[in-house]
Regions:
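Nucleotide-activated chemistry modules centered on ATP-dependent adenylation/adenylyltransferase
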Residues: 1-181
Length: 181
């Protein structure tokens, strides 16, 4: 996503801050990569930490240990505090059922909620980001990309990634002479 934003605004710098909702379950190598990239590109980084919300009693640690579902409140607070009326995300429709029905330009109401009845049609490449005061949009430019599209883009653009991305073990299977994940 960051690479696409750089290309979109080149030769000018990216004109908006980069937002990271930190679950506290990130690998140090990834945080170092994030910080190094932000510094190299001269970006302003906004970090909303789930742990801060747990420490303040605004969120409770889950019994299953995952913090992904806890990201919503820190995200909504960061959007409100930053005065953002739009947020870019890297979600893809092939990742899970909930994202499969997400629009590329997804309207959120004044409570940050997604209501399928309020979503606008996406006809051809016509997208409508209009919203009322208090609402915001989330924009998912990679919605129609597959994981393979992402990896091909990374290869084509020669984007450097932390080694951890290549070290993750995944379940794969062979079908019609191709390895699939």
């Amino acid at each position: 996503m960051l690479h696409l934003a750089r290309k979109a605004f080149w030769p000018a710098p990216i004109p908006f801050p980069v937002l990271h909702v930190d679950t506290g379950h990130n690998f140090p190598e990834l945080l170092a990569y994030r910080d190094r990239t932000v510094e190299e590109l001269g970006l302003r980084l906004v970090v909303a930490r789930v742990q801060d919300y747990i420490d303040d009693g605004r969120l409770r640690e889950r019994t299953d240990g995952t913090r992904n579902p806890l990201q919503t409140i820190p995200l909504l607070d960061a959007i409100e505090e930053g005065g953002f009326d739009g947020v870019f995300g890297g979600g893809r429709r092939d990742e899970e059922k909930a994202r499969a029905k997400e629009r590329i330009v997804s309207l959120r109401d004044e409570f940050g909620q997604w209501d399928p009845r309020n979503q606008r049609p996406e006809l051809w490449n016509l997208l409508n980001p209009r919203h009322r005061p208090g609402e915001h949009v989330r924009v998912f430019p990679l919605s129609n990309w597959t994981e393979l599209d992402v990896w091909r883009y990374i290869e084509r653009e020669d984007i450097a990634l932390p080694g951890l991305y290549y070290a993750h073990e995944r379940e794969v299977f062979l079908r019609d002479g191709m390895w699939l994940a």
